[in-house]
UniProtKB/Swiss-Prot annotation:
GO terms for biological process: cell division; proteolysis involved in protein catabolic process. This is ATP-dependent Clp protease ATP-binding subunit ClpX. Gene3D superfamilies: 1.10.8.60, ClpX chaperone, C4-type zinc finger domain, P-loop containing nucleotide triphosphate hydrolases. The keyword Chaperone applies. ATP binds at P118, T119, G120, S121, G122, K123, T124, L125. InterPro entries: AAA+_ATPase, ATP-dep_Clp_protease_ClpX, ATPase_AAA_core, Clp_ATPase_C, Clp_protease_ATP-bd_su_ClpX, ClpX_bact, P-loop_NTPase, Znf_CppX_C4. GO terms for cellular component: HslUV protease complex. Keywords: ATP-binding, Chaperone, Metal-binding, Nucleotide-binding, Zinc. It comes from Staphylococcus epidermidis (strain ATCC 35984 / DSM 28319 / BCRC 17069 / CCUG 31568 / BM 3577 / RP62A). The keyword Zinc applies. Signal peptide: none annotated. Zn(2+) binds at C13, C16, C35, C38. ATP-dependent specificity component of the Clp protease. It directs the protease to specific substrates. Can perform chaperone functions in the absence of ClpP. The lineage of its organism: Bacteria, Bacillati, Bacillota, Bacilli, Bacillales.
């Protein structure tokens, strides 16, 4: 590129159209020209975009309290677990920001997290909300689909592929992401004697996960490994990827009881039984996880354990109404789009919560219960001109009686609603 002399005639900026005598400089490329003013403008645009891309990661790491506040907007209850997660995630990303030349040569190691709690207690939602809070790529994997390399199922590298896809194949962003592996308790060792049979979905998967949990440069096939064996591999360093492992660990309370029972020999035989299940989980130790079937090397790479409580009726009612994206708010908005008001009675909210507990689905089952109650309404209302309000009652949930429907003047339309 070069500056044209002043004796050149009729040279104009290809972008703004100004003549060369109207600007300070005119620079030429291959058949095109650009003036100094357009160069400055383009430079500003590029700088703004670069700054925006930088902010897509986090420029200022939120404090544990700020992380906790954000979690509180979306996740009801589980205060201890949220506090543990907020501190752990803050320390993890503070460690990443600190990486580089170190005067005291103290190396901060990664601490992955285990979430232990029943189905529907909020494990996945916590992990998702953390990733959203920090604006980092996030991927979910199911441990039950994983097998050792060479067996039918997913390789552990497929977990990394999902994170890379979530980062739009930006490896730098993916290397600072979060991966949530659900149902990690399902890869517990099936037998104390591993020589009896090959445990390809248990201890074998734990062994395969060890390296990526700790930190390694993994080779990831961009289209999945087994169907496209000749594809070029993507290299990704897992050292700074935070792994959150979730599982219900059904029966681990009995493991803890046995350990506590050994310590109370000589006391009343029911001494250990005074602990309820949630109090027992507070007593969990690495040796309990080992007795459950996790190998010591695997446990060592997940040093932080947070326990989630079983949600009671009051907690489930709050989940239905309080979070920013609460289900009641979602369905209310859905019917608003058809100019229909939706209302849930207090008794209906209690009935929904009680049914979720009966089904042992926790918060995860709330949506399906509401869908069952509203399916006919959502089918009929868009073509009904005289319905302006729908009220979900306790009978709607427990007795499958249709909701109360009201017209614009507040008159009850379906007076025969109580006839089953």
């Amino acid at each position: 590129m070069f500056k044209f002399n002043e004796d050149e005639e009729n040279l104009k900026c290809s972008f703004c159209g100004k003549d060369q005598d109207q600007v300070k400089k005119l620079v030429a490329g291959s058949g095109v020209y650009i003036c100094n003013e357009c160069i400055e403008l383009c430079s500003e645009i590029v700088e703004e975009e670069l700054a925006q891309n930088t902010s897509e990661g986090f420029t200022e790491l939120p404090t544990p309290k700020e992380i906790m506040d954000h979690l509180n907007e979306y996740v009801i209850g589980q205060e201890k677990a949220k506090k543990s997660l907020a501190v752990a995630v803050y320390n993890h990303y503070k460690r990443i920001q600190q990486l580089g030349p170190n005067e005291d040569d103290v190396e901060l190691q990664k601490s992955n997290i285990a979430l232990i709690g029943p189905t529907g207690s909020g494990k996945t939602l916590l992990a998702q909300t953390l990733a959203k809070t920090l604006n980092v790529p996030f991927a979910i994997a199911d441990a039950t689909s994983l097998t050792e390399a060479g067996y039918v199922g997913d390789d552990v590298e497929n977990i990394l592929l999902r994170l890379i896809q979530a980062a739009d194949f930006d490896i730098d962003k993916a290397e600072k992401g979060i991966i949530y592996v659900d149902e990690i308790d399902k890869i517990a060792r099936k037998s104390e004697n591993t020589s009896i049979t090959r445990d390809v979905s248990g201890e074998g998967v734990q062994q395969a996960l060890l390296k990526i949990l700790e930190g390694t440069t993994a080779s990831v096939p961009p289209q999945g490994g087994r169907k496209h064996p000749n594809q070029e591999l993507i290299q990704i360093d897992t050292t700074n990827i935070l792994f959150i492992l979730g599982g219900a660990f059904d029966g681990i309370d009995e493991v803890i009881k046995r350990r506590l029972g050994e310590k109370v020999i000589g006391f009343a035989s029911n001494e250990a039984d005074k602990y309820d299940e949630e109090a027992l989980l507070e007593q969990i130790r690495p040796e309990d996880l080992q007795s459950y079937g996790l190998i010591p090397e695997f446990i060592g790479r997940v040093p932080i354990v947070a326990n989630l409580e079983t949600l009671d009726v009051a907690a489930l009612k709050n989940i239905l109404t309080q979070p920013k994206n609460a289900l009641v708010k979602q369905y209310t908005k859905m019917l608003e789009l058809d100019n229909v008001e939706l209302e849930f009675s207090e008794e209906a909210l209690s009935a929904i919560s009680e049914k979720a507990i009966e089904r042992k689905t926790g918060a995860r089952g709330l949506r399906s219960i509401i869908e069952e109650a509203l399916i006919d309404i959502m089918y009929d209302v868009p073509s009904s001109e005289n319905v302006s309000k729908v009220v979900i009652t306790e009978q709607t949930i427990n007795e499958e009686i249709e909701p109360e429907l009201y017209d614009d003047e507040g008159n009850l339309i379906n007076k025969n609603k109580t006839s089953a």
